[in-house]
Amino acid sequence: MSRILESENETESDESSIISTNNGTAMERSRNNQELRSSPHTVQNRLELFSRRLSQLGLASDISVDQQVEDSSSGTYEQEETIKTNAQTSKQKSHKDEKNIQKIQIKFQPIGSIGQLKPSVCKISMSQSFAMVILFLKRRLKMDHVYCYINNSFAPSPQQNIGELWMQFKTNDELIVSYCASVAFG
């Protein structure tokens, strides 16, 4: 008796040819097609059908063997995953601490008739949002509204991370922030 297990992704008309045997294949095909088409729970019936086919092929494994394999391997796998997770977490924390400590230079350039900051270069933590720069300028210039631009080209979102802006748009290891009292561009 030859039995062949083919792909389960066949069309519905081809599902009857998934298992072929030398004797009784026509009867089995018609019974399988009727089971698939007649029931409202097709997914459940398909699973039962595939389970039956596996048992006919002798590929269904013993449940007790599967449980023993799971019990013996699950403990070591979980321990390994816990160790890996702890190591990754500690690396991320140390990297995050280094990133928080690292400060970048911001060079402020006035646009128009707004006053100039002295000193024009300040340092800020990379983890701060751009809203902190806007707030700093408002306080130092004693103004209600300040419009900021990076490299005289675009106005970043207040939620944008200063470290990301610095990595992408730095000039001579400084982030150039131009500021003005009214909208300068666009």
UniProtKB/Swiss-Prot annotation:
Region feature Disordered, mapped onto this chain: 1-43, 68-98
Induction cue: Translation is induced by nitrogen starvation. Translational repression during nutrient-rich conditions is dependent on a uORF (upstream open reading frame) present in the 5'-UTR of the mRNA; it promotes ribosome dissociation. Translational induction occurs in conditions reducing translation machinery efficiency, leading to ribosomes scanning over the uORF (leaky-scanning), and increased translation of the mRNA.
Membrane topology: Peripheral membrane protein
Polar residues bias locations: 68-77
One Gene Ontology term, aspect cellular component: cytosol
One GO MF term: enzyme activator activity
Annotated crosslink Glycyl lysine isopeptide (Gly-Lys) (interchain with K-149 in ATG5) location: G186
Family (UniProt): Belongs to the ATG12 family.
Assembly description: Forms a conjugate with ATG5. Forms a thioester bond with the 'Cys-133' of ATG10. Interacts with the ATG7 C-terminal 40 amino acids domain. The ATG12-ATG5 conjugate forms a complex with several units of ATG16. The ATG12-ATG5 conjugate also associates with ATG3. Interacts with COG2.
Name of the featured protein: Ubiquitin-like protein ATG12
Organism in which the protein naturally occurs: Saccharomyces cerevisiae (strain ATCC 204508 / S288c)
Lineage: Eukaryota, Fungi, Dikarya, Ascomycota, Saccharomycotina
